[in-house]
């Protein structure tokens, strides 16, 4: 196109005949934007320091109209997740992988623009801030796995970096919230009734941990990522776009969530987690994933904890809204969450998949974990008390965690996108917005998974 324009300009300069007039019935194609509405990433090595094969592109052409539920998703929604949980988990994982891993090397997988089967979409405004998207695969920093958190031989702290995406039905609601790139609409989530049934969300979680210390990471799915220079090293001030180092990161966990109306009584979502185990040695390493379990509710009345039987995967028989994979010898041992609710290897063992995501709202009035909370009396909640159990309620898609907040229907990414946008505006305008405050306090996103308190686990398992 550029050569054609140059040639045309040259011909006109040399006195060539004027081009024929445009027909009145011809409508010229709309001009292509040089830049998309939202930045793709925040951090990439300086030019000359590293030349990547390709860079991450944010999938942001959100559907204007709500897409129909795909037939394959209809089949997933027909599987009884309470009784045939493994079939449900396997079907969702196959749906996530289809079109994203075939006929390409590991490093070229999950560039969503390459998927010829279906469209997936990213949440914008994950590029901003010190934990923002790196430019090779779109990974954002989540949590530090302290020594021995991932396994008994893990001596070196490791960082978790992740990228998440939504299918077309989920992308439709993201597009409604971000219809105006300069003024997001948090209320769009509640007005839509939350994410539509048939929304599927996936997140790939990578760790800087080595197979030498975490044996199930052998035969890895390995990417290069532009991350912090050392495990546990986090910038204390502003981070420059070229700050970081290129290191190998390895797939450790895949999370999924399905908006399934059969779970309406407990919140409308089914969450699942898969753990990587390279010993499976499938023809594609992306298939070396073992389902850890599903959860569709928080079991709000269950405060019990049960110790694991030596050599077996722990579980709590009191839980009725969680199912844990207890019989698969290929499942790496996992610590699980509070009261042995579903929680993956890099997740917090004082929470659960559903509990974390249930806090998604704007602004973030309450923190993501009960261990981060402070009561009105200035005290921390006690494990299992009434304040603690606020994080283990069953809230619906239009219910916000705090009455003063606006629900993001379990999307921490969507909540963070608005927080990041407004915080960025604070810097550019030198001002603040009332919507950021509650009880005269600014409430920033505190970290998508949250570290275990340094003073230890307040919920000691009992017999």
Residue positions per predicted region:
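Conserved small-residue
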Residues: 18-352, 360-463
